[in-house]
Regions:
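Alpha-helical transmembrane segments and their immediate juxtamembrane cytosolic regions
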Residues: 1-374
Length: 374
């Protein structure tokens, strides 16, 4: 099995699901949305990309952290490197909002500059994971891994349990709305908005991904990797069942019960689905056809940030390739295929350029040494 192919495949899956959700939502007319069942299936698939991206950020964060630990790098240095990377992603999220505002001017409201989007929360989640891994990373070996695993689970549970009151009875109303929006996604509205990406509950997916990957670093998981992934898949099924069981219970922990948006039971269900997908994708990459020849899904996963950034403007923005809200299901599907092929071409161009640049630097090492000596 090629190293970490399952991660790129999952990212690529998130990209494909994101494309179809955005394309149908942006281009289909209201009449087409009412008359076609396609939009319902599209929206169902659209519930997965954001959790997948954030969960995989936790998985990748664990990989980077453990690799640095194994090299003997001090935990302060690891924390500095990973937290700065999180800050960089957060900065890119702010830059993305500036770009969207500029391209949408004069129709975009200035408040869109302060909207909490998925890149913002990805960056902040990475910062928080950096702090957590620093706190649990003293020493080396299994002890540090177990501490980080337990802390990741605890952090995910804490975020999930704190979400309902922070959305309802204990909202931090004393904060300015741009700050409160990072807590519960209230933005400029009277109530938190489920289409935004506040820390509560979205950062829980990152902590869940972190914990899942540190479980796979255990000695048993390294010896029996397939069995370990199957165990995660089984845990996912159990989590889904437990979520349904808790939802059907008469016991209510919170004054306001909203299963589909802020309740921990729903987050448990979504984490369970992510673990099931993780196992299925791993199995597909290891024993299936995922790596037989060229894989468009893996290719998109290699450049997920790039295609996320670029496709938005050609679907929702000023340069939309089809008229927004005016297309039939068939026409929107044709547009979706066009976006998919265009983003795949962009992804290939990006990776080809990177490979060419690496080869050029290897052939001319003096080019990389020159700046250091100048």
């Amino acid at each position: 099995m090629k190293r970490l192919a399952y991660i790129d495949w999952m990212r690529g899956l998130a990209c494909v699901l994101m494309f179809q959700t955005h394309c149908y939502d942006s281009w289909m007319s209201p009449e087409a949305k009412k008359s076609s069942s396609l939009i319902g299936w599209s929206r169902l698939g659209g519930t997965l990309p954001a959790p997948l991206f954030i969960f995989l950020a936790g998985v990748s964060f664990a990989l980077v952290t453990e690799k640095l630990r194994e090299k003997g790098i001090a935990r302060n240095a690891i924390a500095k490197q990973t937290i700065l990377r999180g800050a960089e992603i957060f900065g890119m999220g702010l830059l993305f909002r500036v770009q969207e505002f500029a391209l949408g001017y004069p129709w975009s409201p200035w408040t869109d500059l302060l909207r909490v989007d998925v890149l913002n929360i990805l960056g902040l989640s990475m910062v928080l994971m950096g702090v957590l891994c620093w706190a649990t990373g003293e020493g080396v070996g299994a002890a540090a891994r177990i501490r980080t695993l337990v802390a990741g689970i605890f952090a995910a549970v804490l975020v999930a349990m704190a979400t309902p009151p922070l959305w309802t009875t204990y909202r931090p109303r004393f904060l300015p709305w741009p700050i409160e929006s990072y807590i519960n996604g209230v933005h400029i509205f009277k109530e938190p908005q489920p289409w935004l990406f506040p820390l509560f509950p979205w950062s829980a997916f990152a902590f869940a991904g972190l914990a899942a990957r540190f479980f796979l670093f255990s000695d048993l998981a390294r010896r029996r990797e397939g069995l370990a992934f199957a165990a995660l898949g089984g845990a996912g099924i159990a989590a889904c069942y437990l979520s349904v069981l808790l939802d059907s219970s008469r016991v209510r922990l919170y004054a306001v019960y909203d299963y589909w948006h802020s309740n921990p039971d729903f987050l448990l269900m979504r984490c369970g689905i992510l673990l099931i997908i993780l196992f299925l994708v791993y199995a597909w990459c290891r024993w299936g056809l995922a790596q037989k020849g060229f894989s468009p899904v893996i290719q998109l996963g290699n450049t997920s940030l790039l295609v996320y950034w670029v496709h938005i403007e050609f679907v929702y923005g000023r340069f939309s390739i089809l008229p927004k809200g005016q297309c039939s299901a068939l026409k929107a599907t044709a547009g979706l295929i066009t976006i998919f092929l265009a983003m795949l071409g962009l992804s290939l161009a990006r990776t080809t350029w990177k490979k060419w640049r690496v080869r050029a630097l290897q052939k001319n090492p003096a080019a990389t040494a020159a700046p250091a000596g100048s």
